[in-house]
Regions:
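FAD-site-proximal beta/loop scaffold in flavoenzymes
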Residues: 1-20, 112-113, 120-191, 198
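Glycine-rich dinucleotide-binding loop and its adjacent helix/turn
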Residues: 1-38, 47-52
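Glycine-rich loop/hinge motif
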Residues: 43
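Residues at the starts of beta-strands that form the adenosine-phosphate
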Residues: 29, 67, 164
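Conserved small/polar residues in nucleotide/adenosyl-binding loops
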Residues: 237-243
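Internal hydrophobic alpha-helix adjacent to the cofactor/substrate pocket in enzyme cavities
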Residues: 188-214
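A Rossmann-like FAD-binding core segment of flavoenzymes
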Residues: 47-155, 161
Length: 245
């Protein structure tokens, strides 16, 4: 996070010293790819820096010259949240000055150019927040994987081909009761780790292992320094609060 902030500030410094208007705009364009919690948080934070914090710091450009884009291939940002909260998050971002682009797929990233199915954006500041590929170790297991390279696992977190090999966290595709894979977030990995560790220590055979059950305590996405949306258990809420983001 600190490296990203440093690179953002360096981009403004480059823009200040650049005489060519087109090149300067390249430094002032910021593109975040991926409308999940990480992408939303980054876009909001960048917008606050670009449109509020540096307004009086430079002479050769002003805050109106900066452009912050958030690109999401799906129909809405934050798809893990309800449509209502997703819409609120979009409104919050747009009020901060972020240009939110949904239903727009990134087809290629060239040097300083983001190519989508709807056009191009020239930028020296391109941040990928659209997810990660699973660990290359999964390929060596020679087991069933999904489209993202994650191991498709049983209800006891073991792989399909060997009940003594376990895969957890964002390297695994564990389907919940609705048939949807659990998100690749820390709480899932922590709970799976405790579950698997307990079975290993107790040397529980597969036919006696209780299925893993994830206890969802809620998720939250921050939007800039003073806005957030969250889901706590089955209750939905939107918050206005101070944060350290």
């Amino acid at each position: 996070a600190l490296d990203i902030r440093d690179n953002i500030l360096k981009a403004f410094e480059k823009a200040e010293n650049e005489l060519d208007k087109d090149v300067r705009q390249r430094y002032l364009n910021f593109v975040v790819i991926g409308g999940g919690p990480t992408g939303v948080e980054l876009a909001g934070s960048i917008a606050e820096i670009a449109f509020k914090n540096i307004n009086k710091e430079f002479r050769n450009f002003n805050s109106n010259d900066s452009k912050v884009y958030l690109i999401e291939a799906g129909s809405r940002i934050l798809p893990a949240f309800s449509p209502k909260l997703s819409f609120k998050a979009r409104i919050y971002l747009e009020k901060l000055g972020v240009t939110v682009k949904t239903d727009e797929k990134v087809e290629n990233i060239e040097e300083m150019i983001v190519v989508t199915d709807k056009g191009e954006i020239i930028s020296d500041n391109i941040i990928w927040a659209a997810g990660n590929k699973a660990s290359s170790l999964i390929e060596k297991l020679d087991t069933e994987t999904d489209s993202e390279g994650r191991a498709v696992i049983n209800q006891d977190c073991s792989i399909k081909d060997d009940d003594n090999i376990f895969v957890i966290g964002d390297a695994a595709n564990f389907k919940n009761s609705k048939g949807d894979p659990l998100p690749g977030i820390a709480p899932v990995a922590i709970q799976q780790g405790r579950y698997v560790g307990s079975n290993i220590i107790k040397d529980v055979p597969q036919n006696k292992r209780k299925p893993f059950k994830y206890m969802d305590k809620g998720i939250m996405a921050t939007i800039g320094g003073f806005k957030a949306i969250g889901v706590v258990a089955v209750s939905y809420t939107h918050l206005t609060l101070p944060t350290n983001v």
